């Protein structure tokens, strides 16, 4: 698997720690919120020597524009249209309650309307669940698997050394 810039993913994880962030579709409120959170924490994450890699399943141009809007244009990206990498990391399609449960509705109001991330129509598979993985020395060190699309991981907590959460 290669990044959109042509870098080999295996080489990346062997060279430095990687925070691998699997996004949902570009229309997802929580995808936008995740990009905002990553942008806000980026300098601190990178100070740990960690490289951020975003994985998406959407149109390259549309995702590039969205990622640029959050000031993350220089972050490595992997376009995984067939969602093989999602599957390799155990990220599945969400169940109805994970996608449309009370937590998701409440957080859409907060993140989408109050915090300005918007509410948009799905552009790709709306059932795909997101996830975040911290890879260190080529090994999976920590992971955050969303139980709901509305879950909000602490990216800094993931890149700090210590046992898996």
Features from the language model and the residues they span:
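Thiol/selenol-based redox catalytic cores and closely related redox-interacting motifs
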Residues: 67, 73-76, 80-150
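Structural microenvironment flanking redox-active thiols in thiol-disulfide oxidoreductases
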Residues: 34-88
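A structure-centric signal for secondary-structure junctions around beta-strands
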Residues: 6, 15-16, 49, 74, ...
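A short, polar/charged loop-to-alpha-helix boundary motif
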Residues: 150-164
């Amino acid at each position: 698997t290669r990044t959109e810039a042509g870098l080999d993913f295996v080489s990346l994880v062997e060279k430095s720690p990687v925070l691998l962030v699997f996004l949902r579709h570009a229309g997802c409120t929580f995808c936008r919120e995740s990009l905002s959170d990553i942008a806000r924490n980026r300098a601190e994450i990178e100070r740990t020597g960690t490289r951020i890699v975003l994985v998406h399943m959407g149109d390259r141009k549309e995702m590039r524009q969205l990622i640029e809007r959050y000031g993350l244009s220089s972050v490595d990206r992997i376009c995984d249209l067939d969602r093989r990498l999602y599957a390799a990391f155990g990220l599945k399609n969400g169940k109805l309650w994970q996608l449309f449960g009370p937590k998701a509705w409440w957080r859409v109001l907060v993140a989408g309307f109050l915090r300005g991330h918007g509410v948009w129509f799905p552009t790709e598979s709306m059932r795909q669940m997101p996830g975040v993985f911290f890879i260190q020395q080529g090994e999976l060190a920590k992971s955050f698997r969303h139980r709901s699309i509305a879950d909000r991981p602490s990216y800094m907590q993931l890149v700090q050394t210590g046992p898996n959460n």
